[in-house]
Amino acid sequence: MTLLFRLLLLLLAALACLAQEASDNSESDPDHIAKLTDDVLWRLDFGGIADVRTFRYTGLPQTRTGTAPMILYAYSFIPKNLDRNTKHPLIVLAHGGVHSNFMTGGPANAATIVRELLELGYVVTAPDYRGSTGYGPAYQRAIDYGGKENDDALGARSWMLERYSFLDPQRVAIVGWSHGGMIALMNIFQHPEAWACAFAGEPVSDLLARKAYLKSMPKTMAESAGEEAANNEEEYRRRSPVTYAAQLQKPLLVHGNSSDETVHVVEVENLVKALQAAGKKFEYKIYQNAPGGHHFNRIDTALARQSRGEIYAFLAKYLQP
């Protein structure tokens, strides 16, 4: 089957899905259409090397007083040449945000990172945690910045381990950049029993420091954590990874960039100071004026590849793919 013909079949399947979604979901929006189209690209680009699937799982209720578990979405990538008769490590890859989703393109370069991880022998799952775009306005509005989204990433780990017996629960890492790095930090600090190690790249780490340099932060907090959180310093602390630095028990690697204009390096520096003050063993590197700013080690430069090589070496030390 030619590549063009395969693409045509996948696009026709996507159109059928769009028609069904449009009839089933009154909240269909352009982000949702873009998401379905991107799902086709994941399968087209990776179908030759991996079993690519989307799955639904459940998480904490959407509201504080609710009892019904919220339905969540995620991707799984399993290398096609994987020996399913032996145990393998798992990477939980948390995308950035605040509002975004797991997609093939853009500066986050997720497709390249997933491909590299698959080639190294990892199984990968990528949760589109509550607040992600592409699943309708209600799902996007359900964001809980620094809160339940962390549990959503943990839930994707649990679902994969329950579903696939060839995954080793002792060899699971969480990896993320930017807002995904924040989720990685919160998980390794608050749920050390679940993870062998974590990598956080240019992570949102200190929301009070962020509020000091980002005028829009109170608005972001109001929209993504509730009106009462907008100027509540205690809420900023409660939702900040730096607050929990003393709880670190597992290996952690952190990267920052002095020229990052999205997550200022002061956040990473504050995190490093908090970890050092608590006497924690961890690894970190703050690059000086690395070209590419916030995305410097996710692009396709020699420096980016070298930096990702350091990340993969760190992961391999603890996951042994």
Question: Predicted regions span which residues?
Answer:
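Cap/lid segment of the alpha/beta-hydrolase catalytic domain
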Residues: 49-72, 80-170, 212, 219
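C-terminal catalytic histidine-bearing segment of alpha/beta-hydrolase fold enzymes
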Residues: 269, 276-321
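Mobile cap/lid helix-loop segments that gate and shape the active-site cleft of serine hydrolases
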Residues: 196-197, 203-244, 250, 277
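Short beta-strand/loop motif that positions the catalytic acidic residue
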Residues: 248, 254-256, 260
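An N-terminal hydrophobic leader/cap segment in hydrolases
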Residues: 19-62
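Conserved alpha/beta-hydrolase "acid-adjacent" motif
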Residues: 261-270
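Sec-dependent signal peptide recognition
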Residues: 2-10
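Primarily recognizes the serine-hydrolase "nucleophile elbow" in alpha/beta-hydrolase
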Residues: 156-212
